[in-house]
């Protein structure tokens, strides 16, 4: 079997961190004996510059045919037209591929706790995964309107939308430490009352998973005071958007956090959570770890290469533990250095 991968370098530092990661993929495929082919397509601001829109039909169709999609980063101050922004291409891609589930791991590895803004003893050993519903909720609810006197956003969830994201979270928890925290605002929101009811019903299908309910404000505090207590956390869209960013600073840098977005069938999208950082683009100083860890997620989830994913992650964690990092993590290496060291480790 030959896996079909679509590469979307995007904007800013996106091309340099993605291209370097693809060089690692070539080494890994030879080492673990699997085949793949790459289609490169412009996306986001780069696509606006070339084609006048952030996501062309050609690129979208290629993504629909793919086994996996790797995205570098998109956006930047260059693209200011509110009706034609790079981010609109990502929203369209998510909707077209029905990418309803967003998965964000947060890990604080041994020796890296000093990077965190929190006390080392509070964060070392943190290993949690956030599951965020991505295509419903207040960002997509209707009706919505805005005028000079009043504005309205609608927070709507159906039973089916809640069930599908909750099943993802339960399955993930069952494969890890067997603990799921469901976050809502059940004390005031009707949508959260339905959310909690559905979670409790679905929990009957997963007796091996222990379920805990937290109100969103309490969860925001517990993420800071005791992040090690969490295994898998599931959120609706708005809560997940906010609190996944809170969780991402626990390791000390956005550059350490990968993510995956997927549907029940079809290709999955893998990308680091950081932005395009146009101020450092082309300077060879970008931290590529988030992109490389996203590649590891792709290896595990879409390319059926769990051993390769484990090896790649362990090499990264070992480098971080020994201070082999870029400047944002306190190290002295540049982007190229990171890829060269990882290439040597993988070839060893």
UniProtKB/Swiss-Prot annotation:
InterPro entries assigned: IsoCit/isopropylmalate_DH_CS, IsoPropMal-DH-like_dom, Isopropylmalate_DH
Binding annotation for NAD(+): 76-87, 275-287
Annotated EC: 1.1.1.85
Single GO biological process annotation from the record: L-leucine biosynthetic process
Location in or out of the cell: Cytoplasm
Cofactor: Mg(2+); Mn(2+)
Single annotated GO MF: magnesium ion binding
Binding-site positions, substrate: 94, 104, 132, 217
EC supergroup of this enzyme: oxidoreductase
Site (Important for catalysis): 139, 185
Pfam families: Iso_dh
Catalytic reactions on record: (2R,3S)-3-isopropylmalate + NAD(+) = 4-methyl-2-oxopentanoate + CO2 + NADH
Residues annotated as signal peptide: none
GO cellular component, one term: cytosol
Disulfide bonds: none
Keywords from the named record: Amino-acid biosynthesis, Branched-chain amino acid biosynthesis, Cytoplasm, Leucine biosynthesis, Magnesium, Manganese, Metal-binding, NAD, Oxidoreductase
Co-factor remark: Binds 1 Mg(2+) or Mn(2+) ion per subunit.
Subunit and partners: Homodimer.
HAMAP family: LeuB_type1
Chain's role: Catalyzes the oxidation of 3-carboxy-2-hydroxy-4-methylpentanoate (3-isopropylmalate) to 3-carboxy-4-methyl-2-oxopentanoate. The product decarboxylates to 4-methyl-2 oxopentanoate.
Family: Belongs to the isocitrate and isopropylmalate dehydrogenases family. LeuB type 1 subfamily.
NCBIfam families per UniProt: leuB
Protein's UniProt name: 3-isopropylmalate dehydrogenase
Gene: leuB
């Amino acid at each position: 079997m030959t896996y079909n991968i679509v590469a979307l370098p995007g904007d800013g530092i996106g091309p340099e961190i993605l291209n370097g990661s693809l060089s690692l993929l070539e080494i890994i495929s030879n080492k673990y004996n699997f085949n793949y082919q790459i289609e490169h397509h412009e996306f986001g601001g780069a696509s606006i510059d070339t084609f006048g829109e952030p996501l062309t039909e050609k690129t979208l169709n290629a993504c629909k045919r793919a086994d996996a999609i790797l995205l570098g980063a998109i956006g930047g101050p260059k693209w200011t037209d509110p009706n034609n922004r790079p981010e609109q291409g990502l929203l369209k891609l998510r909707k077209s591929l029905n990418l309803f589930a967003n998965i964000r791991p947060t890990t604080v590895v041994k020796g890296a706790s000093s990077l965190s803004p929190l006390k080392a003893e509070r964060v070392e050993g943190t290993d949690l995964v956030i599951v965020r519903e991505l295509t419903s909720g207040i960002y997509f609810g209707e009706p919505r309107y805005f005028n000079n006197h009043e504005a309205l956003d609608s927070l709507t969830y159906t039973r089916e939308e809640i069930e599908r994201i909750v099943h993802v979270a339960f399955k993930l928890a069952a494969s890890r430490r067997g603990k799921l925290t469901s976050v809502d605002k059940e004390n005031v929101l009707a949508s959260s009352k339905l959310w909690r009811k559905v979670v409790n019903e679905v929990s009957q299908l997963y007796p091996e998973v222990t379920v805990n309910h937290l109100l969103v404000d309490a969860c925001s505090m517990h993420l800071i005071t005791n992040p090690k207590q969490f295994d898998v956390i599931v959120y609706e869209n708005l809560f997940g958007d906010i609190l996944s960013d809170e969780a991402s600073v626990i390791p000390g840098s956005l550059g350490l956090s990968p993510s995956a977005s997927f549907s029940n069938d079809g290709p999955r999208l893998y990308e680091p959570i950081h932005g395009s950082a146009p101020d450092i683009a082309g300077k060879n100083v970008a931290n590529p770890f988030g992109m490389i860890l996203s590649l590891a997620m792709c290896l595990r989830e879409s390319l059926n290469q769990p051993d390769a994913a484990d090896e790649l992650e362990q090499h990264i964690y070992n480098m971080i533990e020994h201070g082999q990092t870029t400047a944002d993590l306190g190290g002295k290496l540049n982007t190229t250095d990171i890829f060269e060291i990882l290439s040597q480790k993988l070839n060893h």
